[in-house]
């Protein structure tokens, strides 16, 4: 029976259940399905399973399926045409009583709150308070089996105005309430910030589902479906609260590889980490910078400058990038997105479009974020693709090396060769750019040098005084028939004063003058802008840089290799490899040098050769300090030979210079090469120390080709004969000075050893200490022998009788003759007698005379006589018939002649 609302309900307890005071609640919550999603229980999400499906709106109020009014307590409704940006304040504990207040919006942008904003957030009610859950009743069980019984009169909630009593010391606490932790300062609070921009439509991207809040499985039947609405009470209201603030997640998973490095293949979830990787691993200048603007027009101008500076071209006004007011934008380089034949440009992409981009991307991007007081822009202006300007992708180490070589005034072909030789040292990680660096063209090197010099002029406080000169590339054929590049200075034409004379009717008018305009009409007072030629002044000196038609490029005058115009390389700064490459290049182009220039090159070559000799000598001195010649290592001797070759080269260089001074028609390199070749030929042909000299002594009589020798008796004798024959046919050479010195050293050591042995006192030789006790004979291992077949002994036979011969028995006469021959042959051989134990005494009746003779002779023979291959084995004489054996039954059994076990 159901009770009235103001009466206490009757509940029947299960056996073993404690009696808990039932508190009547005033607030109607019997439709809500309460779930505690987080461990600390601070977040409560209310789910209307089927009520939300059928919501009827009438007269400005909303009703659910049971006709109850749905009230929205804390959900704010905004006017149509407004954009709402939700921001979350997250408090992070930094330790030592310090906290960081970070505000994050829907798009994922984070910023630190200012001090006055932090104070404002702290003053907001219910934001930063620590909430301790005081629950006096047992934690509710939300399972369907243990759900409370519902009736027509729903239970009423406790009044919120009544003060809560503190928990008693011994009060019961349920398991869920026990593990509930209070709300901390590090948790997140939600702040709604309205930005009214009626021009922009609402275009908010819904947040993705949070994995922490998992929806419960639907029950079999909702509790309100079991109720009857016949005797319905007063109109109840269902309270819908806004969903709890979710943990702010990044828009993309951190483990997802979205941006892939084009060089090594490493993947990163965000572009900032890819730019940082390109700086650290591939030496690229992909620095991420931040700027701030206060107007969208300023941002558009900045975007235009970035695109012009990085891509080298002016975009048209029709396709100029527009800044959308009050929204965030992202511009990326679309080089990886479109065909390689198209030009790269910065294009705007959305959040969804960015997630669908290909993995290999360019690092150039511009990201705009609207803040409270300004527009924040984060950008990277460094491209990593090869097309267009080569300076986009060249690492800083390569640019430094190029500037160093240009500072030394090395020719462009020498720079190409040096970059190819040093590509592996300049690029610590193997990349695709390595092959590009080994095959850089001269045009790309000129372009790179212009980029480097422009960057230096931009960042230097003192402006350089050098000027640019036009250059032209020419290809000549060297003496060896190969094509060699030459960079020549182009003489600029002289400036002529421009007089506005009468134009020649045969020459068509150009775009520099307006059509139908005669400057004599106005006497030159008002010359229109189209007819005036603007002077393009150089950034450095203010002089006009002339770019003629036959010119292939511009280059700094101080960095141009031109020995004919007093622009020689800086020889004191050149390395040995650079000098060798320069010497080969000058030999190919056959450049005319003065005597001073030739002396300078010769001096530098002699300097490097002398430095090599000194270095090798110091190495030899360190290695051979305190050592004799016999203790030198093979590598040390090889170094000694290298040092000798350097000395020979240096002497030939000096000798060639002396000869060229006497005869200017000769070339130093040719004379030096011929001298070195002659020395090498003489060393190969004339070697008196290494080759045996033929003496005038009479020739010895020729030895016979074959001298019969008895066969060797042992393996050692055979080896000795072979070695003697090898020594006999070995060529005898004259002992070198090194061998004589080695022999004297050995004889001296032998003499010192003998003197030491004579003077040293004699000591008794002690027997070697036994490291292990001797093993007794009975414990020693017995060698394994193959077991042989044994003959069954008869009752009257002796144990020492010889084994019977297997096979077909022979006649008695033949056996006796064979035994007599065997005994006669054994008596003729001289055998050393040994002590033999006496055989056991056997009765005369059992052993016949022939058996006695055979046993005695067999014991005297040694083992080697038995195994002599010259003696042919013969069948043993047959044994005499033994006495028959009687069994218990009287049966006579004769022994068998042969028995095989």
Swiss-Prot record:
GO terms for molecular function: zinc ion binding. Transmembrane segments: none annotated. Coiled coil: none annotated. Residues 829-840 have a biased composition (Acidic residues). Keywords: Apoptosis, Metal-binding, Zinc, Zinc-finger. PROSITE patterns: ZINC_FINGER_C2H2_1, ZINC_FINGER_C2H2_2. One of its GO terms (biological process) is programmed cell death. Residues 846-866 have a biased composition (Basic and acidic residues). A zinc finger (C2H2-type) spans 259-282. InterPro entries: RegFact_GeneExpr_CellDeath, Znf_C2H2_type. Disruption phenotype: Enhances the cell death defect of ced-3(n2427) mutants. Double knockout with the synthetic multivulva (synMuv) class B proteins lin-9, lin-15B, lin-35 or lin-54 results in 100% lethality during the L1 stage of larval development. Double knockout with the synMuv class B protein lin-53 results in slow larval growth. Promotes programmed cell death. Its role in programmed cell death may be in conjunction with cell cycle regulatory factor efl-1 and the synthetic multivulva class B proteins dpl-1 and lin-35, and is independent of the ced-1, ced-8 and ced-9 pathways. This is Modifier of cell death. The lineage of its organism: Eukaryota, Metazoa, Ecdysozoa, Nematoda, Chromadorea.
